[in-house]
Amino acid sequence: SEPHRQYFVDYSRTHGIALASHDDTTVAHVQQAHAEGASMSEFPTTVLAAREAHQHGMRNVMGGPNVVRGGSHSGNVAAVELARLGLLDILSSDYVPGSLLSAVMCLVEQGVMTWPQAVATVTSTPALATGLTDRGAIEAGLRADLIQVHIAELPNGHRHAVVRAVWREGRRVL
């Protein structure tokens, strides 16, 4: 896989594409990724790797399902643990596309992050990290991709986020 890895490292440099490492476990993994130009560590498997990534100015990406499930399905570090340590920057949907809103809600409900902090993990921070400067915030001149959310109170006392409306580039699509 080394020739393929080098191809993607070179391609991302040539074309100005943000590069992420994957499943960093050790300091050496993070240092190699940083040397290759990675600006993100996707799914660091240990607190050690996540800390090292931050020391190199890299953003840590974790999966929404990890937050919702309460931990990694493969026994790696929990996203909530990284959030508590100030090491969680971006949430990705990973293998459950609908997990982002639930993950944001979990982080807030557990008192790990404020609403603005949790929402930034799925909006402005990933947009900036990937060079998508036309989105990620509610500001004049940006795309205006928005969702309207209702927080439903369930009979068991839990709360659940329900999407009520969606706007894409300022036009309501749902």
Regions found by a protein language model. Give the residues of each.
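Conserved acidic residues
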Residues: S39-M40, D89, D145, R164
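Histidine/acidic residue-rich metal-binding segments in metalloenzymes
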Residues: S1-N60, S72-L87
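Short glycine-/small-residue-rich flexible loop motifs, especially phosphate/cofactor-binding loops
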Residues: V9, V30, A50, V104-M105, ...
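His/Asp/Glu-enriched, well-ordered alpha-helical/loop segment
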Residues: H56-N66, G70-I151
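Short, small/polar residue-rich loop motifs at catalytic or cofactor-binding pockets
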Residues: R159-A161
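Active-site-proximal flexible loops/turns
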Residues: H29, L101, A152, G157
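Glycine-centered positions in the ABC transporter ATPase nucleotide-binding domain
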Residues: V166-G170
